[in-house]
C-alpha cells in the first residue's frame, strides 16, 4: 500500500476530488486522519542529534488549498486555523513534488514508519443507494389507492350537486319558526349590539385619554427643546451641515469681527451728532472706599495755620524738583495725559501684518516611481510604516495636492516628566506653488536622484546643481536595501534611508532615524519653527 504523501501527490496531479469529512481525509476507497504524519521531514529537524519531525496531512493539504497566497498571508491564516505551517525553505520543493515537477525529494524519508490508511466499505454505500432508488420508485399499490380516492371524491361531488335546494322549497321565517323564538333571537341580537357599542365607547375614551397625554407630553417636550442650547465644540463647528462649507466659516468670522469691534453697537457715537466737549461732561461721583485714617482727619485749616501744612496735598506722581520748589510749582503742574483705551481690533495688528506660520514644510517627489508619494506619505511619516503606493491605489485612496501630518513625540517638562504632544508638518509635492515666504519653512526634501527634480527652485546654481539647496534644506533619499544607490545621490549631501522588501518590522526604526536627524537639523538651523 502506498504512503499518504504519494496518494496525495497522485490525486493532486490527476486533479481528483479529495473529500474532507470531519477529522478524516478521504481518497476514494482509503481514508486517513487529518493529523496523520507523512514521510516529509520538516526543515531544520533531524540535525545535531535532534529527532526528526514530519509534516502532517492537514498542513500539506492546507498549503495546496492556499497556494495562491503569499507566504506571510498563508502563515497568518494557518495560525488562525490552528494548523501547522509548512516552512518557507520546504515550500518550493514540496510544491514541486506534489505538482509532478519532480519525481522525488531529498526531504522524503523512505525509512519513516508508514501510516496505513483505512479502507472504506463500498458494499454498505451500494446498499444504501439501492434502498434510496427503491424508495424513489412509485409503487403500484399506492397508485391504485390514489385512483380509488379520486373516484370517491368525484362521486361525492356529484351527489352534492344533485342535492341542491330548489327555489320551490323555500319557505318564510314565520312559517318555519314560532313568534316567541323569533323575538328571543331579536333580543339576543340587540343585547349583543349594545355590548358592542359600549365597548367601542370605552375604547374611544381610552384613546382620548392617551391622545391628551401625548399632547401634553408634546407641549412639555416643545418647551424643553425651546430652552436647549447646542453644545458647540471645535469638532462640531468644523462639521458643516450643508454642502457649502464657506457659510459656516463666514458666520463664525462675522461673529468674531462683531465681538472685536464692540459688543454694543449703540455705544458708538452717531455720525450726525454734534461732538460734546469732554470738559462739560458732569463727572460721576466716585464712591469713597474705606480708609483706616479717616478718624485722623483735621477739623479745619485754622488748627494748622501756623505750620503751613496742606492737609489735602500729596506727593504722589511728583518729581524731586517739584517737591523742592514748593506749592507754586505744584500749581503749575499739568496733569499727566491718561491713556485712551483702544478697541480690541485696533490693539491687534492689521490683517496685512499678520503673524507668519511656524509649521515646517517637507517636500516629496511628484513622480509615481518614488517610494514616498502623496498617497502613502501619512503612513510613512506619521504612522511609521511603509505601505506601497500601488496598494493605496487599490484601496481607493485619492491623491491630494498637499497633506498635513501629525507627528507624535514625547516632550520633557521642567519637572522631569514626559508628556506626549502632537506637532503638525505640511507635506507637498509641488514646490513651485509655494510662496516666497514659505521657503523659509522648508526643512526637508526627499531626493529621487535626477537633478531635474530641482528645476525652478531657489538657490539653484547656474549649471543646474542643487548643492546650495542641500546647504539650506536637509535632504533625504528613500530606497530599498537591495537597490543600487543613484550616482547623483552618492555625490550629494543626502541622508540615505534604506527599507527592506519584506521585513516590515524594520520600517519603524528607519523613520525614527529620519525624525531624529531632522530634529537635530532644525535645532541648529530652523529653531524659530514649531517642532
Curated annotation (Swiss-Prot):
What keywords is this UniProt entry annotated with?
Acetylation, Cell cycle, Isopeptide bond, Nucleus, Phosphoprotein, Transcription, Tumor suppressor, Ubl conjugation, Wnt signaling pathway
Q: Which Pfam families match?
A: CDC73_C (PF05179), CDC73_N (PF16050)
- Specify the superkingdom: Eukaryota
Q: How is it modified after translation?
A: Phosphorylated. Dephosphorylated by PTPN11.
**Which sites are covalently linked via Glycyl lysine isopeptide (Lys-Gly) (interchain with G-Cter in SUMO2)?**
198, 301, 308, 321
Question: Which InterPro entries does this entry report, sorted A to Z?
Answer: Cdc73/Parafibromin, CDC73_C, CDC73_C_sf, Cdc73_N
Q: Name one GO molecular function term.
A: RNA polymerase II complex binding
Q: List compositional bias (Pro residues) regions by residue number.
A: 338-352
Which ranges belong to the motif Nuclear localization signal? 125-139
Its main localization is nucleus
The similarity annotation says: Belongs to the CDC73 family.
- Subunit structure of this chain's protein: Component of the PAF1 complex, which consists of CDC73, PAF1, LEO1, CTR9, RTF1 and SKIC8. The PAF1 complex interacts with PHF5A. Within the PAF1 complex interacts directly with PHF5A. Interacts with POLR2A, CPSF1, CPSF4, CSTF2, KMT2A/MLL1 and CTNNB1. Interacts with a Set1-like complex that has histone methyltransferase activity and methylates histone H3. Found in a complex with BCL9L or BCL9, CDC73, CTNNB1 and PYGO1 indicative for the participation in a nuclear Wnt signaling complex. Interacts with PTPN11. Interacts with SETD5.
Q: What is this protein called?
A: Parafibromin
Q: Which organism is it from?
A: Rattus norvegicus (Rat)
The beginning of the lineage is: Eukaryota, Metazoa, Chordata, Craniata, Vertebrata
Amino acid at each position: 500500500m502506498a504512503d499518504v504523501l504519494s496518494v496525495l501527490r497522485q490525486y493532486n496531479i490527476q486533479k481528483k476530488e479529495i473529500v474532507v469529512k470531519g477529522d478524516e481525509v478521504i481518497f476514494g476507497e482509503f481514508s486517513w486522519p487529518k493529523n496523520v504524519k507523512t514521510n516529509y521531514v520538516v526543515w531544520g529537524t533531524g540535525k545535531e542529534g535532534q529527532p526528526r519531525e514530519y509534516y502532517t496531512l492537514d498542513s500539506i493539504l492546507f498549503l495546496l488549498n492556499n497556494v495562491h497566497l503569499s507566504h506571510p498571508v498563508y502563515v497568518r491564516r494557518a495560525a488562525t486555523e490552528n494548523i501547522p505551517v509548512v516552512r518557507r525553505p520546504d515550500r518550493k520543493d514540496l510544491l514541486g513534488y506534489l505538482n509532478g515537477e519532480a519525481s522525488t525529494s531529498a526531504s522524503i524519508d523512505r525509512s519513516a514508519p508508514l501510516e496505513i490508511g483505512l479502507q472504506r466499505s463500498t458494499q454498505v454505500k451500494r446498499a444504501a443507494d439501492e434502498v434510496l432508488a427503491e424508495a424513489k420508485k412509485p409503487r403500484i399499490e399506492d397508485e391504485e389507492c390514489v385512483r380509488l380516492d379520486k373516484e370517491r371524491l368525484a362521486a361525492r361531488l356529484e351527489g352534492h350537486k344533485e342535492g341542491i335546494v330548489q327555489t320551490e322549497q323555500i319557505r318564510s321565517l314565520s312559517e318555519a319558526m314560532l313568534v316567541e323564538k323569533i323575538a328571543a333571537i331579536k333580543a339576543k341580537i340587540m343585547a349583543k349590539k349594545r355590548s358592542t357599542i359600549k365597548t367601542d365607547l370605552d375604547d374611544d375614551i381610552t384613546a382620548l385619554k392617551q391622545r391628551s397625554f401625548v399632547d401634553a407630553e408634546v407641549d412639555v417636550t416643545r418647551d424643553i427643546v425651546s430652552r436647549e442650547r447646542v453644545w458647540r465644540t471645535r469638532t462640531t463647528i468644523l462639521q458643516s451641515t450643508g454642502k457649502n462649507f464657506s457659510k459656516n466659516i463666514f458666520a463664525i468670522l462675522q461673529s468674531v469681527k462683531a465681538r472685536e469691534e464692540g459688543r454694543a453697537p449703540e455705544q458708538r457715537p452717531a455720525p450726525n451728532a454734534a461732538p460734546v466737549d469732554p470738559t462739560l461732561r458732569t463727572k460721576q461721583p466716585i464712591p469713597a472706599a474705606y480708609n483706616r485714617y479717616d478718624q485722623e482727619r483735621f477739623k479745619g485749616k485754622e488748627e494748622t495755620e501756623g505750620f503751613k501744612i496742606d492737609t489735602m496735598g500729596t506727593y504722589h506722581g511728583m518729581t524731586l524738583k517739584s517737591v523742592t520748589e514748593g506749592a507754586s510749582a505744584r500749581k503749575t503742574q499739568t496733569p499727566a495725559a491718561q491713556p485712551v483705551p483702544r478697541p480690541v481690533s485696533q490693539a491687534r495688528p492689521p490683517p496685512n501684518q499678520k503673524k507668519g506660520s511656524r509649521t515646517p514644510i517637507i517636500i516629496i517627489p511628484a513622480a509615481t516611481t518614488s517610494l514616498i508619494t502623496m498617497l502613502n506619505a501619512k503612513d510613512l511619516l506619521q504612522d511609521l510604516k511603509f505601505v506601497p503606493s500601488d496598494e493605496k491605489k487599490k484601496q481607493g485612496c485619492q491623491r491630494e495636492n498637499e497633506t498635513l501630518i501629525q507627528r507624535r513625540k514625547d516632550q520633557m517638562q521642567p519637572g522631569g516628566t514626559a508628556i506626549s504632544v502632537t506637532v503638525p508638518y505640511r507635506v507637498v509635492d509641488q514646490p513651485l506653488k509655494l510662496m516666497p515666504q514659505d521657503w523659509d519653512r522648508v526643512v526637508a526634501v526627499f531626493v529621487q536622484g535626477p537633478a531635474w527634480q530641482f528645476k525652478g527652485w531657489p538657490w539653484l546654481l547656474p549649471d543646474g546643481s542643487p548643492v546650495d539647496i542641500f546647504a539650506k534644506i536637509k535632504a533625504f533619499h528613500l530606497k530599498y536595501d537591495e537597490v543600487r544607490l543613484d550616482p547623483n545621490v552618492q555625490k550629494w549631501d543626502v541622508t540615505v534611508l534604506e527599507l527592506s522588501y519584506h521585513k516590515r518590522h524594520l520600517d519603524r526604526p528607519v523613520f525614527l532615524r529620519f525624525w531624529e536627524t531632522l530634529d537635530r537639523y532644525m535645532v541648529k538651523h530652523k529653531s524659530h519653527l514649531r517642532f
